[in-house]
Amino acid sequence: MSINDVTIDTSTYYSILGVPTNASTNEIRKSYMKLAKKLHPDKTKSEHTAELFKLVVDAHSILNNDQLRAEYDKKLILEGRFELHQHGAKQKNKDIRKGYTFKRNSKPYEQQPYGFGVQVPKGPHEESNYEANSNPHNENSSNNDTKMKSTNLHDTLSKDSEDKHGTDDASDIQPPTKSNDIANEVGSKRKSNSKDIHQDHSSNIGLNPLKKKKLEKKAVHATTTESRRYMRKKSEKKATPPIQPLADLQINDDWEKLREVLQRIEKEDSRGGKEFTLDIDVNEQMYNLSMESSDDEHTIPTKKRAKVGSNIQGNSRYFAQTAAYDMNQINANLGTRNTEDDRQASSKISITEIDDILDLLKERVPSPPKLGHLGVQRDQQNRALEYIKYTDELKKRILYVLSNSSTTEAMQHFNRHTQSVLAHKTMELRLCEKLTEIQKCQQGVIEYFSRTALG
């Protein structure tokens, strides 16, 4: 269908939007916006625009949704119409560099002259009066011209460096041109320098071997200042190391300073130890003697006597305060738990405790009363209560003995008194078994009484 120069193929949704089957969401949206602007009913007065606009909207809604688009693609594949209406999809992702070969205008770094040929003086045939263009838009063209000139200079200088040994003599008699004036001047200078050095080397045949080596090196490396940088080999390149060597340190002087410091520290430590021993000696002397009864009072000088006397008096007061201190007070306050011997600790399992355990083990657990032959309910209830009270008292006695047992303290010395501790533990286990037996009997009596009471 065609309306107002708009042709639409209504066979598929892809053909309605004019998009291939592999189109992206952006392409679908762009084509939808174009068609919507042209076919909108408000902008066109034809009758068929509303129907076409509905078709475009339906196509966009289905193709913009991934699930609906996948279902629609399956339907087209089954019908065999999936790739029939692609309308020449444009291949935008093309390799731009395909089929193009770029030539390298510049030489390698080792063959490039110093300054890249920009600062080389101009020849006589080149124009000296160059007027720069004032228009800023033409700066790129001027830069390109300078680049082309520099590349031509690189080519000429590289050719001269390859022919530095002068194999062809005919190259020296070439007519001057605009492109090779500078190259001829540089090559003539280089050849003249190399010839002079070779002549000096041939004339000095009877020299020492060291001088011969120096002359040979000069002959090999006979170059001009312009070609000196790129003719240098890798082995002869000047390279600064990443970590520069430090200046020579005076190690002996540093060690002597350290020794002096260590000796001072040792002297200070030795002085402190002597002072500490002197204080102890003075305290011992003041405990037995006093300052008034000492015979050495007249032998000590007056200045030293005042210092020693003040120290002795202060130390004597401190010693008088601490001399009456006794360790028995600590033992009396803390008790005998931490200051006891192992034998005293083993005697914690007293004989009375063992007797109580044995008495409880000898007592038999009373059998539960037979309440079935008693006809009256009150008699059954009284008999059951008496049994429970008696067993409760027995349980209290057993629990009291177990709670006050001293096996926990005796276990601290288990390595020496193993037999006594194990015997005591076995008796406690028997008491626990008896306690469980009493509990079972009480439970049976209570259950039977509850059944009979409830009927």
From Swiss-Prot:
Domain J: 12-76
Disulfide bond annotation, renumbered to this chain: none
Main location: cytoplasm
Keyword Cytoplasm: yes
Entry annotated with the keyword Ion transport: no
InterPro entries: DnaJ_domain, DnaJ_domain_CS, DnaJ_subfamily_B/C, J_dom_sf
Localization (cell): Cytoplasm; Nucleus
UniProt-recorded Gene Ontology molecular function terms: Hsp70 protein binding
Gene: JJJ2
Key words of the record: Chaperone, Cytoplasm, Nucleus
A Pfam family recorded for this sequence: DnaJ
Low complexity composition bias: residue spans: 133-144
UniProt name for this protein: J protein JJJ2
Top-level taxonomic group: Eukaryota
GO biological process: cellular response to misfolded protein; chaperone cofactor-dependent protein refolding
Annotated Basic and acidic residues bias: 156-168
